[in-house]
Design a protein with these regions (language model features):
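Extracytoplasmic
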Residues: 61-66, 86, 90, 201, ...
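Transmembrane-helix motifs of polytopic, lipid-linked glycan transferases
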Residues: 112-142
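Short hydrophobic alpha-helices at membrane interfaces in multi-pass membrane enzymes
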Residues: 136-142, 162-192, 222-231, 299-310
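Membrane-interface alpha helices of multi-pass inner-membrane proteins
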Residues: 146-148, 182-199, 204-210, 234, ...
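Hydrophobic alpha-helical membrane-interfacial segments at the cytosolic entry of transmembrane helices
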Residues: 41-48, 216-243, 354-367
Length: 655
């Protein structure tokens, strides 16, 4: 009996040993497969990272697009204060937005940062795919999305997407406590950097922070909450100090940046294909539907993903569809593709079959639209990527003389002014209107910019007044180079009415430079005259009605025009964009229609005569006005978005 019992015990022990051995083998095999899979994911997406590496070296050139990049680099070199000396959609770290070689140290910083952000983006994707045990199909989908989206994705979106992915992973699959806190400090610093590159990035960062604050309070995680908030605020302060900014100017920077953002939808809107608008609305609609579904069905991970990415999607939507041209809509489609691909990969098990199919349909529609606009994006340019890296490394390792020669060559190509103009300017302070800052950079002029150094960016009456006040101050430049130029079929004299009035009062024409672009050279008057005006008449009218223009002699005529959105228009402006407004200028010979930015017109638009060329502009500066305008008419195709009543106050000022 005892022998049978002993035999049974040995048999049980052998069975247990065999099971343990089998389990160990299975575990070992599973670990090996997992390790191989992770290595393969890292390798494949590292290759994709190389194939989508951004341009790390651009040489400055003369154009509107490059002009503001040059301006931001020059502003950094001059130590100008953002919010006080400079008011622009970009902030104190705006020079890092695009690595143009305007000055070696700033280029090196921006190039290194651009490369770091790209690597961080790829790293966050790899971590996501590894941590969530993504399938091969998921990896293929994400790889395709990256190949199409990354080549044109802007640096602030790359950075913020990386941040929201890492934070999302920390929420649904927490790291160990210490690494988690280190991650929070790191992403807070990255959000602070993005916030100081571009103001809209601060809005996205704010939405991410709000989500994390609510989440930490809900989970009663006080230490992580404090870590995130204090790290973000501390990083902002440190970066402001490192960039030479005074903290006291930061509130003004926020206020003016908000004014720019608020005016953008009205001033810069452009309409594009209806099909692309429908895709954008479908993307937003599907995201809202997914949020409602996740709340009703208690799908916390899906709720977290949608909420943490909500600000990113909203800003991308506004970015792409307010100024709806091929480059801006590409950015929205690329960002939407990244968001929906990541959401599908991380949360497909929480979706119903219908929602999975709808998400996949949207993803492939986005892929189709991106591919249609830029079909070569999917074709790897291996040689080109090696050239990008090689040219950046070459410049970084060149001696100072070689770099100076390269920069001088770029500046030489920008120079379009006559020798007489350069001789006249000498070392006097100078500003350029409307935007060609490349001349100041190319000739090494003593640039003294107005706060909004691109006229078309003074979207509101308050921003226009900032420039006007600058030209009345002691800092006003000695010389102005004034050319005709604007955007979107606007009327250039209406872009900055208060600023124009101040220039007419305080500057005098000297001569015209006609070598390439036509510039009127203006000098500051010996004595600054006080601003005086006299009201002529006040007229209440309606949209679409002709407004007669008074005829006056010996003085300049201006008109303050007051119109506004109704509730529907304000809603459209907030969530999408309002319909454009137009102004028709009628003379005895011509009737011309221009896009009209009515928020600026509150400062008083110039109506003494119509202006078509540089000679007409010179006549205005000389006081030789023709009083040829008979009437103006303000109209829109969609008056339902506006209060129909308009008030016009005509006033005159001395020549």
């Amino acid at each position: 009996m005892s022998k049978d019992k002993s035999f049974k015990q040995r048999r049980i022990q052998r069975t247990q040993v065999n099971k343990s051995s089998a389990a160990a083998k299975i575990s070992s095999h599973t670990g090996s497969v997992k390790s191989q899979r992770n290595i393969l994911i890292t390798f494949i997406f590292s290759i994709i990272g190389f194939l989508t590496i951004p341009n790390l070296l651009g040489l400055p050139y003369s154009s509107l697009e490059c002009s503001w990049i040059i301006g931001l680099n020059m502003a950094k070199g001059l130590g100008l204060q953002f919010g006080k000396d400079i008011v622009f959609p970009f902030g104190p770290l705006g020079f890092m937005y695009s690595p143009y070689f305007c000055e070696f140290n700033t280029w090196l910083i921006s190039s290194a940062f651009c490369l770091f952000v790209h690597c961080l983006f790829i790293f966050s994707i790899i971590i996501m795919l590894k941590k969530l045990f993504s399938s091969p199909i998921d990896c293929v989908l994400m790889g395709l999305a990256l190949m199409l989206a990354l080549p044109q994705t802007q640096i602030e979106y790359k950075l913020l997407f990386s941040v929201l992915i890492l934070l999302y992973l920390s929420v649904v699959s927490p790291f160990k406590p210490k690494p988690q806190l280190i991650l929070y400090v790191f992403v807070s610093f990255m959000m602070a950097a993005a916030s100081l590159i571009k103001f809209t990035a601060m809005l996205v960062s704010g939405s991410i922070l709000i989500f994390m604050v609510v989440f930490c309070l809900y989970k009663k995680q006080i230490i992580p909450l404090c870590c995130i908030l204090f790290s973000y605020i501390g990083s902002m302060l440190i970066l402001l100090v490192l960039t030479g900014q005074k903290i006291v100017n930061f509130p003004a920077y926020l206020l003016h940046s908000y004014e720019l953002s608020d005016g953008y939808s009205s001033a810069m809107n452009v309409n594009g294909p209806v099909s692309e608008v429908c895709v954008g609305l479908c993307a937003v609609g599907l995201l809202i539907a997914l949020l409602l579904y996740s709340i009703l069905k208690s799908k916390p991970n899906l709720i977290y993903f949608i909420l943490i990415s909500a600000g990113f999607v909203f800003v991308s939507f506004k970015h792409g569809l307010v100024r709806h041209d091929i480059s801006h809509i590409y950015i929205f489609f690329a960002n939407a593709l990244l968001i929906f691909s990541s959401m599908y990969i991380t949360n497909k098990k929480q979706l119903t079959s219908l929602l999975r199919y709808l998400s996949l349909i949207l993803i492939f529609v986005l892929i189709a639209f991106i591919f249609k606009s830029s079909p070569r994006q999917i074709i790897p340019d291996i040689e080109g990527k090696f050239k990008i890296i090689g040219s950046a490394v070459s410049l970084a390792t060149d001696d100072a003389a070689t770099r100076a020669k390269i920069l001088e060559g770029a500046k030489r190509k920008m120079r379009t002014l006559e020798d007489e103009t350069i001789k006249y300017i000498g070392n006097k302070s100078v500003d350029l209107i409307p935007w060609e800052i490349s001349q100041a950079y190319g000739y090494n002029l003593n640039w003294a910019p107005r706060p909004i150094f691109h006229c078309y960016c003074a979207y509101t009456d308050k921003l226009d007044m900032l420039n006007s006040q600058y030209y009345e101050s002691d800092k006003a430049p000695d010389i102005l180079l004034y050319a005709i130029g604007t955007l979107d079929s606007r009327y250039s004299l209406f872009d900055a009415p208060a600023t124009l009035r101040t220039i007419l009062r305080n500057y005098k024409p000297v001569f015209v430079d006609n070598r390439f672009h036509s510039y009127i050279i203006l000098r500051k008057a010996d004595t600054q005259r006080l601003s005086t005006s006299r009201t002529i008449s006040v007229l209440d009218t309606e949209i679409g009605k002709s407004i007669p223009v008074p005829k006056i002699k010996d003085r300049y005529l201006f008109a303050k025009i007051y119109m506004d959105y109704n509730l529907l228009g304000k809603t459209a402006k907030l969530f999408y964009k309002p319909p454009s407004v137009y102004i028709k200028l009628t003379t005895d010979k011509t009737t011309l229609e221009h896009k009209f930015i009515f928020s600026i017109a509150r400062n008083g638009i110039f109506l003494s005569q119509s202006m078509h060329d540089i000679n007409g502009l010179l006549d205005i500066f000389n006081g030789n006005v023709s009083n040829d305008l008979n009437s103006i008419t303000i109209s829109t195709k969609y008056p339902a978005f506006y209060n129909k009543h308009i008030r016009v106050e005509f006033f005159e000022v001395p020549k």
